[in-house]
A protein has these predicted regions:
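The conserved 3'-phosphoadenosine-5'-phosphosulfate
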Residues: 171-282, 286, 300-301, 306-312
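Surface-exposed cleft-lining segments at the edges of enzyme active sites
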Residues: 89-90, 148-160, 275-280
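Generic structural signal for small/hydrophobic residues in well-ordered secondary structure
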Residues: 33-34, 86, 102, 111, ...
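PAPS-dependent sulfotransferase catalytic core
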Residues: 1-93, 104-105, 109, 118-151, ...
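Short catalytic/ligand-binding loop motif for oxyanion handling, primarily in non-cytosolic enzymes
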Residues: 35, 93-96, 119-124, 190-195, ...
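A structural signal for short, well-ordered beta-strand segments and their strand-loop junctions
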Residues: 49, 85, 110-114, 180-185, ...
Length: 312
């Protein structure tokens, strides 16, 4: 019996969160299939997800100050007592203030985190930022960032720090009991995503016989047509950008988000990036190996295969 299913069968108590609270939060990891997970779970008639890629309410202090009722109107369409709210923010696992806000919102909230091989996650994160126009150099250009280890450097935090999972899980365990967090390996999610969704349906005490369509893969990083256009779109979509504020006032409901997605998609090609350079893969494997060992000790899950060369 899979570990996740066994744990779920021992915990079949209903979510104690009150009405219109988040029942389950996907908290990470960044570039680990979280958008796909959210959308797969959202197919269930007893669950409701937000169309936005991320729910920023717990992560963004300015949004949090406006209160959850405001966030509820922004992210969800007519939530009812008959459906449970599912949310996702792929960066929440690195934000202790965000985790604390989530606990204050619903101490009984169930958490899900998908952990991807840190070498792959680092490369995928780099490609995403390259598409956004935030970084122009080759992947090899982050080697000095890795060696310097400057945590005040955003490149270290985005590419390296977000892959040090044991540090972030130790922080999360300070605020939520282990039985409220489900850890899923990215390899398992890719291999049996429908089965994992069924196990999560059981955990949420909704009809687990519902069949999830997991054929579509979401948020795949493609090569952009124009780096300059990518940078412009990122600037336009920042919450504090006056143009975005104006668009929000003029467009009803969630149309501003849909416009943002349209602007991003215009710049995408059908081309995918190449494989990670082997020299960088080896360097990162050696760097992450002791961290992977600590992660295995903390979780009781074997992650030693992440120390091996990547398979093509």
């Amino acid at each position: 019996m899979p570990i996740l299913r066994a744990a779920i069968m021992m915990d079949q108590t209903p979510n104690p969160g009150p009405e219109n609270k988040i029942s389950l939060m996907i908290i990470g990891a960044q570039k680990a299939g979280t958008t796909s997970m959210k959308n797969y779970l959202g197919q269930h008639p007893s669950l409701q997800v937000h169309p936005h890629k991320e729910l920023s309410y717990f992560f963004d202090p300015l949004e949090y100050e406006k209160g959850f009722d405001t966030a509820l109107r922004k992210y969800y369409d007519h939530p009812s007592a008959s459906t449970q709210l599912i949310a996702k923010n792929a960066g929440l696992y690195v934000s202790e203030s965000g985790i604390i806000r989530l606990k204050e919102h619903n101490p009984g909230c169930k958490l899900v985190i998908i952990l991807r091989n840190p070498v792959e996650r680092t490369y995928s994160s780099y490609l995403m930022e390259k598409n956004y126009g935030a970084i122009n150099g080759t992947f090899e250009s982050i080697e000095p960032v890795l060696r310097k280890g400057d945590t005040s450097d955003w490149r270290y935090e985005f590419f390296i720090g977000m892959s040090l999972y044991q540090t972030h899980l130790a922080m999360i365990y300070k605020h939520f009991p282990k039985e409220q967090l489900r850890i899923i390996r990215y390899e398992d999610f890719k291999a049996r995503s429908a089965e994992l969704c069924t196990e999560l349906f059981e955990w949420l005490n909704v009809d687990a016989s519902f069949k999830t369509d997991t054929a579509t893969k979401y948020n795949v990083t493609h090569i952009n047509r124009s780096p300059s256009y990518g940078r412009l779109v990122v600037q336009l979509l920042r919450n504090q950008n006056p143009v975005k504020k104006l668009v929000r006032k003029l467009m009803p409901g969630k149309m501003d988000y849909k416009v943002g997605e349209m602007l991003r998609n215009i710049n995408k090609t059908n081309k995918l990036y190449g494989e990670i350079p082997e020299s960088m893969s080896k360097l990162l494997r050696e760097y992450y190996a002791p961290h992977n060992e600590k992660l295995s000790e903390l979780t009781g899950i074997d992650f030693s295969d992440w120390n091996k060369p990547l398979t093509k």
